[in-house]
Swiss-Prot record:
It is found in: Cell membrane. GTP 3 binds at residues 56-59. Mg(2+) 2 binds at residues 21, 24-25. Mg(2+) 1 binds at residues 21-22, 24. Belongs to the TRAFAC class TrmE-Era-EngA-EngB-Septin-like GTPase superfamily. FeoB GTPase (TC 9.A.8) family. GO terms for molecular function: ferrous iron transmembrane transporter activity; GTP binding; metal ion binding. It comes from Methanocaldococcus jannaschii (strain ATCC 43067 / DSM 2661 / JAL-1 / JCM 10045 / NBRC 100440). This is Fe(2+) transporter FeoB. Residues 3-165 form the FeoB-type G domain.
């Protein structure tokens, strides 16, 4: 079977992931790009007896290689030379999207344009002459609406034709053609350079691109080219200030001409998006509205998920009893029932909460509102010393700190990036939610949503204060500002929301099936063994026995340090195991208190006071990041900063928990 490799590329929020999923279905492979931890998604599909491998490149606005994502996209297209590059273009923002298109054409890529969101463009009064656009660019243009699955078959057909009918389209830049021609006439004298598109090399040399400059410096023609290039750049610098700015200006002149020829906007009235943004992005009103929006999100999550959690809780309690009564070998029965089933069950009981939370977040994302939160809060972030782009990473931190830290790669300034990474673990990821849900349900049942929301708010407040102090004491420079795309509002597409929800829930389940199982088994082993050897599986029913275990030794060693908070050795031990993954804390508590998930809430209600429980939640929010987060911090900014993060978070967690305990006990 003949096979081809194609790449999908486009600006962020153009529907690239939706098109990738529509093309590949479930045939998706997720890994990392070589040398970095940026996620690499690959998939495949078959059409007319041919196989197509699809590579989903990171979302980028340009290929100027100022960020890791841009470098990955550029290097892949230049070095891997895919059979076809499918450029996803947002029909509602044609002018902005065509900038990347022109850069791809400059590279000499075999190009196909997928003009997405045509239905939305039509509703906004935007008309695009697809045939004329195709003629001007010299590449095939396929109109579609991926969210409604319209045009996907047309896209597959166009791909199957374009991979065979390879051609390089070229856009002329009138004011720069003489310079480009002069440079390429020298470059073509070196046969080794002909593996690259010479026009692309010439344009990038005019832009002072260091990557291309290094390629040409090692060529046979560099000595001849250097004085010619310097002369041209000096001439352009006098005219434009910088030669690079001249190229950018020329691209936008071409884009402006194209847009005027192919696009008409028939509606002159205010759009729904413009009317909503007058209110929702207002500096004062918009900021105030964020709080009730987030409160409703949490209210929805817990009210709807409660009966589903109760059913899972009952199932795992029943399963644990069945295993104990069915397996004669008490060691194996205890490992399965008290270890794996009890521990994992205590975590999975929060699966509905996470599912509905992710659903609500995906709903807000697809509606277009979530993108406004960074925009609305940008000025506030700058007052606390954070760069504008940090807001995007912070919002992602509410899902998982690992991808949130990776997202800081779009921050160009190194000090800004390090600062953003250091404060990100203070933002409450979804893995901490089971801890909050357990304690809030056990001791604050009437105010469960408010208590949990307060944990998220506490994390944000601490992150902002920490950022302000670090900016003053360590990173003594001004933060950069945010440039972010605000997509139009629209009614969320259920299939897109469900797809995003499932991907996030699946990540949680995958983690629950690996790290959590390992964690609870480790806790079980340390519980049934002690300094004197094997204690027996009865430890979970006999508090006297488990008090002699290794896990008790660990907890009792730490207990005096945490006695002001009112926590016993079991609580201290659970926090230690939470370093593996925060989800492990709940499973550890279930085993250490010798109960299944069905009775854990009542046990917690007796073991903790409201004040000590709230302090425990706060400590869980702030203290050491999980192993995965610590590993990615080390990879991104090194061991020095990773150890710094561990140290300051432990100190901060202890101080905050102590303050809550002291003040709480004085007041209540």
């Amino acid at each position: 079977m003949k096979s081809y490799e194609i790449a999908l590329i486009g600006n962020p929020n153009v529907g690239k992931s939706t098109i990738f999923n529509a093309l590949t279905g479930e045939n998706v492979y997720i890994g990392n790009w070589p040398g970095v931890t940026v996620e690499k998604k690959e998939g495949e599909f078959e059409y007319n007896g041919e196989k197509f491998k699809v590579v989903d490149l990171p979302g980028v606005y340009s290929l100027t290689a100022n960020s890791i994502d841009e470098i990955i996209a550029r290097d892949y297209i230049i070095n891997e030379k895919p059979d076809l590059v499918v450029n996803i273009v947002d029909a509602t923002a044609l002018e902005r999207n065509l900038y990347l298109t022109l850069q791809l054409m400059e590279m000499g890529a075999n190009l196909l344009l997928a003009l997405n969101k045509m239905d939305l463009a039509k509703s906004l009064g935007i008309e695009i002459d697809v045939d004329k656009l195709e003629k001007i660019l010299g590449v095939k243009v396929v109109p579609l609406s991926a969210a409604k699955k319209m045009g996907i078959e047309d896209l597959k057909k166009a791909i199957s034709i374009a991979v065979k009918d390879k051609k390089t389209a070229e856009i002329k830049y009138p004011n720069f053609e003489p310079y480009i021609k002069k440079i390429t006439s020298i470059l073509q004298k070196d046969e080794d350079l002909k593996k690259y598109n010479l026009r692309y090399l010439a344009i990038k040399l005019l832009e002072n691109d260091k990557y291309v400059e290094e390629i040409v410096k090692n060529s046979k023609v560099w000595n001849e080219l250097k004085p010619v290039l310097d002369s041209i750049i000096n001439e352009l610098s006098k005219k434009y200030g910088e030669a690079e700015l001249g190229i950018v200006e020329e691209r936008y002149k071409v884009i402006d001409k194209i847009v005027k020829e192919v696009m008409k906007k028939t509606s002159g009235k205010l759009t729904t998006t413009e009317m909503l943004d007058d209110v929702l992005t207002d500096e004062k009103i918009g900021t105030l509205l964020i709080i009730p929006f987030l409160w409703m999100l949490f209210k929805f999550t817990f009210d709807v998920s409660k009966p589903f959690s109760a059913m899972i809780e009952y199932f795992f309690g029943f399963l644990s009893e069945v295993v104990k009564s069915s397996i004669s070998n008490k060691f194996i029965a205890s490992l399965l029932a008290d270890g794996i089933i009890s521990g994992v069950g205590a975590v999975l009981v929060f699966f509905p909460i996470l599912a509905f939370l992710f659903f609500a977040i995906s709903f807000l994302e697809d509606s277009g509102y979530m993108a406004r939160i960074p925009f609305i809060t940008d000025r506030i972030m700058n007052k606390f010393g954070l760069p504008g782009k940090a807001v995007i990473s912070m919002v992602m931190g509410f899902g998982c700190n690992v991808p949130a830290i990776m997202a800081t790669r779009t921050i160009e300034d190194e000090k800004d990036r390090i600062l953003t990474i250091l404060i990100n673990p203070l933002l409450s990821c979804s893995a901490r939610l089971p801890i909050y849900a357990l304690f809030a349900g056990a001791l604050f049942s009437k105010y469960q949503g408010v208590v949990i929301l307060s944990m998220y708010a506490l994390g944000v407040v601490l992150a902002l204060i920490t950022a302000f102090l670090f900016r003053k004491l360590i990173f003594k420079t001004s933060p950069s500002y945010l440039i972010v795309e605000l997509p139009p509002y629209h009614i969320p597409h259920l299939n897109v929301v469900l797809k995003n929800t499932w991907e996030r829930v699946y990540d949680f389940l995958r983690k629950a099936g690996t790290i959590i199982v390992f964690g609870v088994i480790l806790v079980w082993v340390l519980s049934v063994y002690g300094p004197s050897g094997y204690l027996g599986e009865e430890v979970f029913e006999n508090p006297q026995l488990i008090a002699n275990s290794w896990v008790a030794v660990i907890g009792k060693t730490l207990a005096p340090l945490f006695s002001p908070m009112g926590w016993d050795w079991r609580a201290c031990s659970a926090l230690v195991f939470g370093i593996i993954a925060k989800e492990v804390v709940v499973g550890s508590l279930a085993m250490l208190y010798g109960t299944g998930e069905e009775n854990l809430s009542s046990v917690i209600a007796h073991a903790f006071s409201p004040v000590s429980a709230y302090a425990f939640m706060a400590f869980s929010l702030i203290y050491l990041p999980c192993i995965a987060t610590l590993a990615v911090i080390k990879q991104e900014i090194g061991w020095k900063w990773a150890l710094f993060a561990v140290t300051y978070e432990m100190i901060l967690a202890y101080v905050v928990a102590l303050v809550i305990s002291v003040i709480g006990n004085l007041l209540f």
